[in-house]
From Swiss-Prot:
UniProt-recorded name of the protein: Release factor glutamine methyltransferase
GO biological process annotation, one example: peptidyl-glutamine methylation
Listed GO MF terms: nucleic acid binding; protein methyltransferase activity; protein-(glutamine-N5) methyltransferase activity; protein-glutamine N-methyltransferase activity; S-adenosylmethionine-dependent methyltransferase activity
Gene of this entry: prmC
Claim: Transferase is one of the keywords in the record: yes
Binding site for substrate: 181-184
Pfam families in the record: MTS, PrmC_N
Length: 290
């Protein structure tokens, strides 16, 4: 086993993988359904398992993300199928959604929740799992992505609604709470991104026009129709887009705040649909604002 893992690690290193030993072990642990690294070193592989292991290693060597090789991720207690038709849920999103869940648990009067551009369904399904009093609707423009989200809802026994369509088009009434992770990479950022992103994750879910800001202009134009008066929304944004997004919404008379993550990078934009200029902080634990 030591020899196999050493060869696997050396192969991944030669392919530019940043943490080759850890990833060689992770891929093998997933294949053998072993949760302990110490148990891994005691395992024995059949010739068929070795062949399958090297097949997965070669995929990783081609810079296919590990999550796509495994075919699943865990997100706040929800097991999600992930394929190249959907984005891989990010850790910073998981940390943030924990706080959104806390907000909904504190504000029981907020009973309708939209997860727009839902992809795998990670946000909406996690909200439904932890906030059963909330009616959750997930939407996406991609039929393939929506099919995966629906499959994830079934496998986790979570009752939610699904709508197929572009941004806010499929919704017929406004929500109390909205979360949207629109495409926000510029062309330049996309072509400079890691091969794991550029060559494997879905272009349509990543790129928001030449500047990366196309969808925020559209959202700002129609946000009053999608949120009830007093409704709140959080939009995921690029790490340097905070000021630009704030100006887009302010130009439409919508006040909001940029929330930063633990690394002090722009991460979310909080907004509230109300007639006056006062906006509640939108701050959640671990995310500062400006």
């Amino acid at each position: 086993m030591k020899k196999l893992l050493r060869e696997a690690s050396e192969y991944l290193l030669s392919r530019g993988i940043r943490f080759p030993q850890r990833e060689a072990e992770d891929i093998l642990m997933d294949l053998l359904e072993i949760s302990s690294r110490s148990a891994l070193h005691q395992a024995k592989l059949s010739s068929e398992e070795q062949s399958l292991y090297w097949k997965r290693l070669r995929k990783r060597g081609d810079r296919c993300p590990t999550a796509y090789i495994h075919g699943k991720v865990h997100f706040l207690g929800v097991e999600l199928q992930v394929t190249p038709q959907v984005l891989i849920p990010r850790q910073e999103t998981e940390i943030f959604v924990e706080q959104i869940i806390g907000y909904l648990q504190m504000h029981k009067e907020k009973t309708t929740f939209y997860d727009v551009c839902c992809g795998s369904g990670c946000i909406g399904l996690a909200v439904r799992k932890h906030c059963p009093h909330v009616r959750v609707t997930l939407s996406d423009i991609s039929p393939e992505a929506l099919a995966i989200a629906e499959s994830n809802a079934r496998s986790n026994a979570l009752a939610v609604d699904f709508l197929l369509g572009d941004l806010f088009d499929p919704f017929s009434f406004p929500a109390d709470v909205l979360v949207c992770n629109p495409p926000y990479l510029s062309y330049k950022e996309f072509f400079e991104s890691d091969p794991e992103v550029r060559c494997h994750e879905p272009w349509k879910a990543l790129v928001g026009g030449v500047s990366g800001l196309e969808f925020y202009h559209r959202i700002a134009t129609h946000i009053h129709k999608i949120l009830v008066s007093g409704g709140v929304g959080w939009l995921e944004i690029g790490s340097t887009q905070g000021e630009d997004v704030k100006q887009i919404f302010h130009a439409k008379g919508i006040r909001g705040r940029v929330l930063k993550d633990y690394a002090q990078l722009d991460r979310f934009f909080f907004l509230e649909n109300q007639a006056n200029d006062a906006v509640s902080s939108g701050e959640v634990s671990g995310f500062s604002e400006r």
